[in-house]
Amino acid sequence: MGRGKVQLKRIENTINRQVTFSKRRSGLLKKANEISVLCDAEVALIIFSTKGKLYKYATDSCMDKILERYERYSYAEKVLISAESDTQGNWCHEYRKLKAKVETIQKCQKHLMGEDLESLNLKELQQLEQQLENSLKHIRSRKSQLMLESINELQRKEKSLQEENKVLQKELVEKQKVQKQQVQWDQTQPQTSSSSSSFMMREALPTTNISNYPAAAGERIEDVAAGQPQHVRIGLPPWMLSHING
C-alpha cells in the first residue's frame, strides 16, 4: 500500500519540531541555491526560527540589492493598485452622480409635459407654471425674430427683382427704338430707288425713242440749225448732227 496524504499541521512535540525544522531548512536552502543556479534567477530566502535565529540565502550574496529591488516593485505595485482603486472609486462616484442628474432631468421633463404632477405641491406647481410662461415668452420672441428676418429677406429680394425689372424694361425700350428706326429706314429706301429710276428713264427717253417722235425731232433740228445751244441736251447721234450741218 502507498503512503497516504500527510496532513500538514503544527508538530506538538518540541524535539520533533526542532528536528523537522532543521531538515526542512537545509532542504529549502538547497532548493533555493539550485533554482538560482539552474534558472539564472535572483533568489532571496529569509528564515527565522521559533527562537528568532536568522537563516538566509541570496543569489551572489546580494541580499540588500534583491531586497531593494523588491521594495521598489512592491511600492510601484501598491501605487498602481491604489491608483486603480481611486480611479474605480471616482468612476463609481461619477456614475452615481450622473445617474442622479439624468433622473432629475427626466423628472423635470415629465413635469414640463404635464406628467407625474401628483407629487408636486402648490408652490412647486406655481413655479412650474411660471417656468412654462417664461419658456413661451422666449419661444414667441424667437419666433417673431425669425419672422422679421424672413420679411427683411423677402423685401431685399423684392428690391433686387425690381431693379432687375427696370434694367430689362430699359433694354426692351432701347431694342424697340432700334427696331422702329430700322423699319423707317427700310420704308424710305424703296421710294428713293423708285425716284432715281424714274429720273434716269426721263433723261434717256428722247434718245432711245427719237424715231417714234418725228415732229419733236424736227423742231429740235430746226433749233439746232438756228444756232441755239439746245443740241447739247437733245442727245442726238453724231451722224444726224453731221447730216444737219451739211
UniProtKB/Swiss-Prot annotation:
Residues 88-178 form the K-box domain. PROSITE patterns: K_BOX, MADS_BOX_1, MADS_BOX_2. Residues 180-199 are annotated as: Disordered. GO terms for molecular function: DNA-binding transcription factor activity; protein dimerization activity; RNA polymerase II transcription regulatory region sequence-specific DNA binding. GO terms for biological process: positive regulation of transcription by RNA polymerase II. Highly expressed in sterile lemmas, at intermediate levels in stamens, and weakly in lemmas, paleas and carpels. Residues 1-61 form the MADS-box domain. Keywords: DNA-binding, Nucleus, Transcription, Transcription regulation. It is found in: Nucleus. Gene3D superfamilies: Transcription factor, MADS-box (3.40.1810.10). InterPro entries: MADS-box/MEF2_TF (IPR050142), MEF2-like_N (IPR033896), TF_Kbox (IPR002487), TF_MADSbox (IPR002100), TF_MADSbox_sf (IPR036879). One of its GO terms (cellular component) is nucleus. SUPFAM superfamilies: SRF-like. Probable transcription factor. This is MADS-box transcription factor 14. It comes from Oryza sativa subsp. indica.
